[in-house]
Structures are given as C-alpha cells and as structure tokens.
C-alpha cells in the first residue's frame, strides 16, 4: 500500500470538499490514486463537488481577456447558482484565470468531450483503426489501443482536460471542482470564443530578409546626363 501523506489528503480535500478522514480513507482504499479516490468519494456520496454537480447554474459572469499586444482575445461565460457568488472576487478571479487558460490553448475548441460532434469522433476512430501499426492484431486489442488514442485526441481539444497553466499538476476541471468546494455552489464553463488577429485571412507571403536587403541595397550611381551641344552663331563684322 502506498504511503499517504498529509499533502495527498489536503489535495484530495481541496478537490472534493470531503472531510479529512474520509479523504484519507479514500486514498488508502485506492492505493494513493487521486482519481480513483475521487470516484470512491462520489460513489459514497461524500464529495461535495459531486453533490452540487446537478444543481441549476443560471447566474454567473461573462468575462474577456486580451493578450498583450492585442493579438489574441477571449470571451468566456462561466455559470454559478446565485448572483451572490457571481459578485464574489474569488469567482471573478476564477473566470479571468479560465479566460487566460483559453488564450494559452490554441488547439482547444470545446468545453468538454460531450460537445464534440459524433461524426468527427467516428472519422477519427476510422482513421486510427486503419493504421498500419495495427495490422495483424486481434480486434479486441485493436479496439483497446484505438480507444486509448481516441480519448487522448478528444481530450486535447477540450478545455476542462487541459493542465492548468498556473499549476500543471491539476486540470481545469479540477480547478473548477476546487472552486465549487470553496464557494459552495455548482459552477460550469458554458461557452467560450477565442479570437486570433488575422485568422482566416489569406496573407501575402513575403521574405523579410529579402525585403530588408532590397531596402538597404545601395542605389547604382547615376551617370551624369550628356550635355546637349549648343551651336553659337558667329556674329558678322559690321562694315
């Protein structure tokens, strides 16, 4: 059995809002595995975050973040249960942190995997099943390998499964769970939009080095223009 430290217990408590002794027991029962311990607490009905997950979230906040230089912009809506929490500084900070997270994740397109269109999922699965690396393997092994790769691909597209930029040891989903436990209300990231300056516009490709060289190249010396010959009329002598 893995040794359970006070840090492990505190981490689980922050994620779930369960009691210290319940968290310790959950970790002991699951050999120190945090994810299994969370599932254990939910099954036992001891996770506060799990208890709140079904409650209606009709309040919240729409916030924005513009990255330095104005190259990237984000709009995000995060919902909670009451306007009291929506006005809370901790909630406002959470929403702003999520907006910054979105700005830092160019590949993220969805909040969670249940938003991904089924036709996209099927297409990705078909491509993976046709891989040369799987030729000759039994169907059940193929299915297991493909499902693992597919899950990884889909999670890479979803905000909640990204490592949190301020603490890579947790995901955005876990950050949200911590906030739920701390503020005592259910919360959800409802939707977001990420803007990138010039995205979708066809730009004329140019070689910067060549442009600079052309601008700094000394101009060829101009030859002085040839002087036009002028004929002078000889003045006749007066008689």
UniProtKB/Swiss-Prot annotation:
Record region (Involved in Mg(2+) ion dislocation from EF-Tu): 82-85
Listed PROSITE patterns: EF_TS_1, EF_TS_2
Similarity comment: Belongs to the EF-Ts family.
Protein name per its UniProtKB record: Elongation factor Ts
Positions with biased composition (Basic residues): 229-239
Organism: Acaryochloris marina (strain MBIC 11017)
GO molecular function: translation elongation factor activity
Keywords from the UniProt entry: Cytoplasm, Elongation factor, Protein biosynthesis
Localization annotation: Cytoplasm
Keyword match Amino-acid biosynthesis: no
Name of the gene: tsf
HAMAP family: EF_Ts (MF_00050)
Known role: Associates with the EF-Tu.GDP complex and induces the exchange of GDP to GTP. It remains bound to the aminoacyl-tRNA.EF-Tu.GTP complex up to the GTP hydrolysis stage on the ribosome.
